[in-house]
Every structure is written in structure tokens, then in C-alpha cells.
């Protein structure tokens, strides 16, 4: 009797398990069939928000939030496009709702999806992610980059810090009121004390490399010129009144020596040719001289050449007078 009851209980348990398995399998098959035939109750998000053959599921997910649907299908039909012909008659007439007073989509007091709103709400009382009047970038308006604005600077409190510390008592690397670039400001210059030094020493008694009041560029100013004594007794490289460019003054020298009346290009003018004495030289002297004389003779017969020579002579005379005047002015200055 006991064996029969045990066998019956085992059979009952086995049948129950088999029924549950079949029921679960049937539900799965039914669900798959519904998904295949698009008969399930889930909103078909993959079809797109505005699919015509899908009814919005107000009772599921975020669609139950009325704020989500606010402005989407209400009176201003923004989904028609910004430049739809709807409302153009009123848009272009002057008056309160004229084109010069309207916003992006119509009236002057509306924003993108409603009246005077910002990105996610009404414009007049929100900022980027909340209310404008009391928030900053990530919170309230009275804060700075990483905290409250009125009591912080870049990395701390603004009113009592500078770049890396307190503002009112530091400079770039220390205290501002008593330092310069690398030390105290009121009693130093660039590399020392300001009131008693110049660039490399004391200011009131030095020049560039020494004392200012008694030196020139490289020595004493009142008694030297560029490289030595002052201009009244030297020229460019020596005494001015008795030298020329490289030696004695112009009245007794030429370009490289004595003046033009007794030298040529590289020596005496009246007794040399191009590379030597003119009257006794050959291929580069006599022949050239002969050609030059022949060419000069033929040119002299041309009236235009004579006019040009007169002009050149006048120009040379004017140039010579100007040079002499400049030399006289330099002599007077010295």
C-alpha cells in the first residue's frame, strides 16, 4: 500500500513539472509570435517618434509625462517647418507681431518650442540647465568656475589672493608692495636698487658703461668724438679739420690719397691710363685711348650730345657745390 502511494506521488510530481514546462514554453512561443506580427504592447521606438502606424503609448515609460508632450502637437505647428506658408499673412504686416519683433518661429515673446523659453523651459527664469537668475555654469549664479564667485578667484577666494596666493600682499612671486621683478620694488632696479643705479650700476653718475655726466659712448662725452676726442678736433677716424676720408682733409687728397688734381683712379691722373701710364701703354691702354678719342670725336659732332654734356656739366657743378656746403657745415659744427 505504501509503495503504491509513493509511486502515485512521484507520478503527480512529474506531471506537474511537465505541465509547468509546457506552459512556460507556450508563453514564450506566444510572445515571439506577437513580436513577429507586431502585436505586442511595447511602443515601437525603433520605428521613430512620429511613425503614422504607431500610436504613442501614453501609459508607458516617459510618454506618460505630460511635460514630454508639451509643445509637440500644440497650436504652433513647429513640425511643419520654419518657413511654412501658415501664418505668413500676419507675419509680414507691421505692428506688434511684425517680422522685426518676432523670434525664431513667430512672436517676439516665444522661443524654440513655446513662449520666451530657453533650451528646456522658460527663458526668463532658467539658464543652461536651470534657472538663470541664481545659477552659474553648473549651479547658482553667485559662484565662479569651481565655487561661489563673490568669494573665490581662480583657485580660491578672489578678494584675498593673487595668481598663486593673496593679491593684496604679493606680486608675481612674492609680496607686491615691496618687491620688483626679483626683489623689492621701491629700492631696486632691474638687478639692484633703482634709485641709485642705472642699467649695470648707479644711474645718476654713470652712462652706458660708466659715468654719464663725464663720458661719451666709450669715454668722456665733453671731450671726445665717436672714437676719441670730441668732434671739434677730430674727423671720422682722427682730427676733422685736417683729414679727408682716410687721411688729410679733402683739400689736399683724392679718393685714396692726394686730391683729384694730382692722381687718377689708382695714382696720378695726368700721366696714367687705365692700368698704367696712359701715353705709353698698349692693348688695354693705347688702343682703348684711340677708340675713345675716335668715339668722342664722332659724338661731339652730335648736337644732342652737346646738350647732354652741358646738362651733365651743370649737374656736376651743382653736386660739387652741395658737397662743399656740407663740408663747410660740418666744419662749422665742429
UniProtKB/Swiss-Prot annotation:
Bias (Basic and acidic residues) ranges: 115-289, 303-334
UniProt-recorded name of the protein: Antho-RFamide neuropeptides
Residue segments, region Disordered: 115-334
InterPro entries: FMRFamid-related_peptide-like
Residues with PTM Phenylalanine amide: 120, 129, 138, 146, 155, 164, 173, 182, 191, 200, 209, 218, 227, 237, 246, 256, 266, 275, 284
GO cellular component terms given for this protein: extracellular region
Pfam families: FARP
Presence of the UniProt keyword Disulfide bond in the record: no
GO-annotated biological processes: neuropeptide signaling pathway
Species, as recorded: Calliactis parasitica
Job description of the protein: Not known but it could act as a transmitter at neuromuscular synapses.
Organism taxonomic ancestry: Eukaryota, Metazoa, Cnidaria, Anthozoa, Hexacorallia
Signal peptide limits: 1-26
Keywords: Amidation, Neuropeptide, Repeat, Secreted, Signal
Locations listed in the record: Secreted
Protein family (similarity comment): Belongs to the FARP (FMRFamide related peptide) family.
Propeptide: 27-116, 122-125, 131-134, 140-142, 148-151, 157-160, 166-169, 175-178, 184-187, 193-196, 202-205, 211-214, 220-223, 229-233, 239-242, 248-252, 258-262, 268-271, 277-280, 286-334
Expression (tissue specificity): Neurons associated with smooth muscle fibers.
Coiled coil segments of this chain: none
Amino acid at each position: 500500500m505504501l509503495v503504491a502511494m509513493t509511486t502515485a506521488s512521484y507520478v503527480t510530481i512529474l506531471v506537474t513539472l511537465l505541465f509547468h514546462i509546457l506552459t512556460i514554453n507556450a508563453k514564450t512561443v506566444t510572445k515571439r509570435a506577437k513580436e513577429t506580427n507586431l502585436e505586442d504592447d511595447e511602443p515601437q521606438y525603433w520605428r521613430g517618434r512620429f511613425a503614422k502606424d504607431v500610436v504613442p503609448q501614453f501609459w508607458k515609460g516617459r510618454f506618460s509625462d505630460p511635460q514630454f508632450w508639451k509643445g509637440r502637437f500644440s497650436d504652433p505647428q513647429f513640425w511643419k517647418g520654419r518657413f511654412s506658408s501658415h501664418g505668413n499673412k500676419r507675419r509680414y504686416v507691421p505692428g506688434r507681431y511684425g517680422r522685426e519683433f518676432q523670434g525664431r518661429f513667430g512672436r517676439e515673446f516665444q522661443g524654440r518650442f513655446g513662449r520666451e523659453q530657453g533650451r528646456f523651459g522658460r527663458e526668463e527664469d532658467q539658464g543652461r540647465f536651470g534657472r538663470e537668475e541664481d545659477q552659474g555654469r553648473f549651479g547658482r549664479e553667485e559662484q565662479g568656475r569651481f565655487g561661489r564667485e563673490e568669494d573665490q578667484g581662480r583657485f580660491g577666494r578672489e578678494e584675498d589672493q593673487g595668481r598663486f596666493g593673496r593679491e593684496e600682499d604679493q606680486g608675481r612671486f612674492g609680496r607686491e608692495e615691496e618687491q620688483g621683478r626679483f626683489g623689492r620694488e621701491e629700492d631696486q632696479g632691474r638687478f639692484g636698487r633703482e634709485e641709485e643705479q642705472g642699467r649695470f650700476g648707479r644711474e645718476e653718475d654713470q652712462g652706458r658703461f660708466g659715468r654719464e655726466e663725464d663720458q661719451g659712448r666709450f669715454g668722456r662725452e665733453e671731450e671726445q668724438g665717436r672714437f676719441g676726442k670730441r668732434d671739434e678736433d677730430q674727423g671720422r677716424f682722427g682730427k676733422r679739420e685736417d683729414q679727408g676720408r682716410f687721411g688729410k682733409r679733402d683739400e689736399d687728397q683724392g679718393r685714396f690719397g692726394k686730391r683729384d688734381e694730382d692722381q687718377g683712379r689708382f695714382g696720378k691722373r695726368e700721366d696714367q691710363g687705365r692700368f698704367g701710364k696712359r701715353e705709353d701703354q698698349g692693348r688695354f691702354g693705347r688702343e682703348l685711348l684711340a677708340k675713345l678719342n675716335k668715339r668722342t670725336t664722332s659724338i661731339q659732332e652730335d648736337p644732342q650730345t652737346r646738350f647732354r654734356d652741358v646738362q651733365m656739366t651743370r649737374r656736376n657743378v651743382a653736386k660739387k657745390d652741395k658737397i662743399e656746403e656740407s663740408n663747410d657745415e660740418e666744419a662749422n659744427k665742429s
